[in-house]
């Protein structure tokens, strides 16, 4: 029997760094790596997210985070408390932090087409820069406020679910 066409052999040969298990909240993410996570408190949020974020840094992956501008410093402090050298990661291009106005709410409103393009650009850029993966963490509390375009959020998430399977990168 010729095993050269055996799909199992092909998968073994295709094994790369990006095929390492990606852990989140005590589970391993599968092929679908878009997770919507809800938390009861900031402490719970960081108890779940910090090991996921740290794992990416330990593997020399890129981190791209979007946060509430009012919580920027607290977010950076939480990363530092996990042993992440944020200034070094920023200088090395391994970490980028944007606030809502520079991502979801450019020009003061949510434009789903523009946001979908940004996510694809970020994930493509990470690959082009030589990172095995980009771990994208996006805080979306802005969606609870009355920003123009927020009514398009469900459609945006649906469209995002059609785009993300093209990538191995986890998006939380």
Functional labels for PLM-detected ranges:
Residues 1-172:
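Non-catalytic regulatory/interaction regions at protein termini and inter-domain linkers
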């Amino acid at each position: 029997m010729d095993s050269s066409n055996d799909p199992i052999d092909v998968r073994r040969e295709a094994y790369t760094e990006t095929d390492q298990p990606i852990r989140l909240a005590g589970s391993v993410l599968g092929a679908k790596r878009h997770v919507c996570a809800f938390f009861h408190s900031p402490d719970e949020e960081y108890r779940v997210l910090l090991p996921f974020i740290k794992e990416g840094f330990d593997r020399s992956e890129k981190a791209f985070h979007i946060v509430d501008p009012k919580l920027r410093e607290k977010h950076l402090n939480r990363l530092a408390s996990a042993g992440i050298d944020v200034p070094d990661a920023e200088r090395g291009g391994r970490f980028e932090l944007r606030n809502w106005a520079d991502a979801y709410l450019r020009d003061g409103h949510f434009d789903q087409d523009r946001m979908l393009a940004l996510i694809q650009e970020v994930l493509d850029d990470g690959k082009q820069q030589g990172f095995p993966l980009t771990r994208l963490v996006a805080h979306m509390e802005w969606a609870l406020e009355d920003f123009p375009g927020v009514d398009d959020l469900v459609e945006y998430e649906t469209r995002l679910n059609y785009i993300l399977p093209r990538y191995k990168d986890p998006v939380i």
